[in-house]
């Protein structure tokens, strides 16, 4: 549980006190005024649809220990004094930076944590869930809830971690250069992985190389850790089929003294998968092996050939942190599918559906089509595809790729939903 005094929060974040006392202690942070109470810090954000500052008075009435706002709404200073709350204002009215500084301070107060950073274009949440499952075979683990992986979600993940936690698995997302540098500086991961470099957010970053370099920013925040289990030196896990792996290793990891683990299907990889097959339900079967000769057969509980690389990355990190390989693999193999990510939905007497509707990318759409067409089918195969956002000038080409990929599959019906980009798929 978080435990920081209001005075410590002011010092750590550079925020200013508008009104109210400074002698309280904050034990949790929320963005929802309905959760405000004694011991809680309510942080108001002016969002696109809702302005959290409008709910500051409600948080004060609920006796939140801290209420952070932009320009304080009328009457808030008086309410803070009346209810004994500390009303604060972030430096530059930057709520994101306030959270990052606060979470960074909490991280520094807990050097015993080994933080694992998870980033990549696709597969972050599934790999994060696999990692958390495998690491729990040995450690007390705190992990990102859902996909809270941005400049707000990552700090909230750290701020909800307890000093008794041993490993924190932190998913880190980005759609602009510089974001991962800020996230990594806050979380200070010791080990990290990059699932892949795809085309997600290419409209904002310009090219896949720019995406790769933005992902590689995670290296800049990595540092050794020391816990009851011993010292851990920084290492980064990469898939060997990542065509930017050499760039990331040579220009980022090596200069920073970060060891690189390679996973894939090459004989020289540190963790390998061989003999990959899919059963009638699309579930992968393969032989997992390590460079030292250890191997074990594996059948996964989630569909798709593409998830095998996620398993390899998770196993590489679990092994590096000293988790028994058999125990970690057993827990990972028994995991259910992550919600809305190639989730197979079935009901008696109803069609089998694959829900991959969360934040798709061209590569994840292709993976969903692969899974659909790998499953045994007694009826019709139907694909319903929507448009992919944040592709910029590459949108026509990449939507055309999706359409061509779908056309080459044994589908009985293809439904395209959208406007201009959907026409490009057709």
Where are these regions (language model features)?
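Residue-level signal for inorganic ion chemistry
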Residues: 9, 40, 59, 102, ...
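Alpha-helical segments flanking ligand/cofactor-binding loops in enzyme cores
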Residues: 34, 57-58, 181, 209, ...
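Short acidic/polar active-site loop segments enriched in Thr and Asp
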Residues: 65-66, 166, 190, 412
């Amino acid at each position: 549980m978080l435990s920081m005094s209001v005075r410590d929060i002011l010092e750590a974040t550079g925020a200013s006190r508008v009104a109210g006392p400074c002698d309280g202690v904050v034990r949790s942070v929320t963005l929802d005024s309905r959760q405000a109470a004694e011991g809680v810090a309510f942080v108001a954000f002016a969002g696109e649809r809702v302005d959290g500052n409008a709910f500051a008075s409600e948080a004060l009435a609920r006796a939140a220990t801290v209420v952070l706002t932009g320009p304080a709404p009328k009457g808030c200073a008086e309410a803070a004094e009346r209810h004994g709350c500390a009303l604060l204002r972030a430096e530059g009215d930057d709520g994101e930076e306030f959270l990052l500084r606060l979470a960074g301070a909490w991280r520094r107060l807990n050097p015993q944590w080994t933080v694992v950073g998870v980033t990549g274009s696709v597969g972050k949440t599934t790999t994060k869930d696999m990692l958390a499952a495998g690491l729990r075979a040995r450690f007390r683990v705190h992990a990102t809830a859902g996909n809270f992986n941005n400049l707000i979600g990552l700090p909230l993940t750290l701020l909800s971690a307890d000093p008794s936690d041993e490993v924190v698995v932190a998913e880190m997302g980005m759609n602009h250069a510089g974001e991962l540098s800020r996230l990594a500086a806050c979380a200070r991961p010791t080990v990290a992985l990059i699932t892949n470099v795809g085309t997600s957010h290419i409209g904002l970053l310009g090219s896949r190389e720019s995406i790769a370099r933005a992902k590689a920013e995670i290296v800049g925040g990595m540092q050794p850790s020391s816990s009851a289990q011993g010292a851990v030196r920084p290492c980064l896990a990469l898939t060997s089929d990542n065509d930017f792996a050499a760039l990331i290793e040579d220009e980022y990891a090596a200069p920073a003294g970060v060891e690189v683990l390679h996973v894939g299907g090459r004989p020289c990889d540190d963790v390998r998968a061989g003999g990959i097959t899919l059963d009638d339900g699309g579930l992968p079967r393969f032989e997992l092996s390590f460079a030292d000769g250890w191997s074990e057969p594996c059948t996964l509980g989630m569909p798709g050939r593409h998830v095998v690389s996620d398993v390899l990355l998770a196993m590489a990190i679990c092994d590096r942190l000293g988790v028994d390989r058999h125990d970690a693999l057993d827990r990972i193999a028994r995991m259910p599918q992550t919600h809305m990510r190639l989730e197979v939905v079935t009901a008696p007497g109803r069609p089998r559906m694959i829900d991959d509707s969360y934040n798709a990318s061209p590569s994840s759409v292709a993976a969903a089509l692969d899974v659909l067409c790998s499953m045994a089918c007694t009826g019709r195969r139907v694909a319903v595809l929507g448009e992919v956002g944040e592709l910029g000038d590459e949108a026509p080409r990449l939507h055309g790729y999706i359409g061509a990929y779908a056309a080459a599959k044994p589908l009985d019906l293809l439904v395209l939903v959208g406007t201009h980009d959907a026409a490009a798929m057709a």
